[in-house]
Design a protein with these regions (language model features):
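N-terminal Rossmann/SDR dinucleotide-binding element
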Residues: 1-39
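NAD(P)-cofactor binding segment of oxidoreductase domains
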Residues: 40, 54-82
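Catalytic helix-loop patch of NAD(P)-dependent Rossmann-fold dehydrogenases
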Residues: 61, 65-69, 89-131, 135-136
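NAD(P)H-binding glycine-rich loop region in Rossmannoid oxidoreductase-like domains
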Residues: 25-62
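Mid/C-terminal beta-alpha module of Rossmann-like enzyme folds, strongest
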Residues: 1, 177, 184-211
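SDR active-site strand-loop-helix element
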Residues: 15, 40-44, 81-86, 91, ...
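NAD(P)-dependent short-chain dehydrogenase/reductase
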Residues: 119-166, 171-173, 179-180
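Conserved catalytic-core motifs of eukaryotic protein kinase domains, centered on the activation segment
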Residues: 50-57, 92-96, 141-142
Length: 211
């Protein structure tokens, strides 16, 4: 929503599952045709990494089938599509940063379904961009920062892993990066974006409660 505030010259449609079920092919195609959509930015996903192992069908439906429907509808309407993806398309064992040229190697249902979703988007829409990000947080929705703030108020102590390293990324910064891609003209391909610096989930939690 930061894009709408900073770039009000465009018309934006923000949808949730009540307004548009992106798993419903007919609903997607009808909506895009009626609204004359020129660009789709898909931020929707099944993001419960652990639960995805037991809910593989739902994860596949939301992370793979839904992006395919969006991409197909975008292509039919002459629209571009940006698919927001994840660092989980890699297994996290590398000791150097992952670049766009690195071969994906997911080791979870979540990562696998997100990778398949990337492929579907690239296969079904000529003007397609995949942007991978990591450890996303925002004032909207559920995310690690909001969870830690809530748990910090409810509990005297918290147990947080310290051996997983990543880069927390502010959703507003990701939105601005997406707009930069749009503003310069959609160049088909895969992009990586995150904020700077690295930390563990433990370090991140400590920083959250210092603020």
């Amino acid at each position: 929503q930061v894009l709408a505030k900073e770039n009000p010259q465009h018309t934006y449609y923000f949808t949730d599952v009540q307004e548009l079920d992106i798993c419903d092919k007919q609903a997607v195609w009808t909506y895009m045709a009626e609204k004359q959509i020129e660009l789709v930015v898909n931020c929707a996903a099944y993001t419960a990494v652990d639960k995805a192992e037991d809910n593989q069908e739902l994860a596949y439906k939301l992370n793979c089938e839904a992006p395919k429907q969006l991409a197909s509808a975008a292509q039919a309407n002459g629209a571009a599509m940006i698919q927001v993806s994840t660092d989980y398309v890699f297994d996290g064992t590398a000791h150097i940063p992952y670049t766009e040229d690195c071969d994906p190697c997911p080791d979870s249902v979540y990562g696998t379904t997100k990778l398949e979703g990337e492929k579907e988007v690239m296969n079904h829409c000529e003007q397609a961009v995949v942007i991978r990000t990591a450890w996303l947080y925002s004032t909207f929705g559920n995310n690690f920062v909001k969870t830690m703030i809530r748990l910090g108020k409810e509990r005297d102590s918290l147990g947080v892993v310290f051996d997983q390293i990543g880069t927390p990324t502010y959703a507003n910064d990701l939105a601005r990066a997406i707009y930069a891609i749009i503003n310069k003209g959609i160049v088909r391909g895969i992009y990586h974006f995150s904020n700077e610096g690295v930390c563990s989930w433990y370090d991140f939690t400590v920083a959250i409660h210092r603020l």
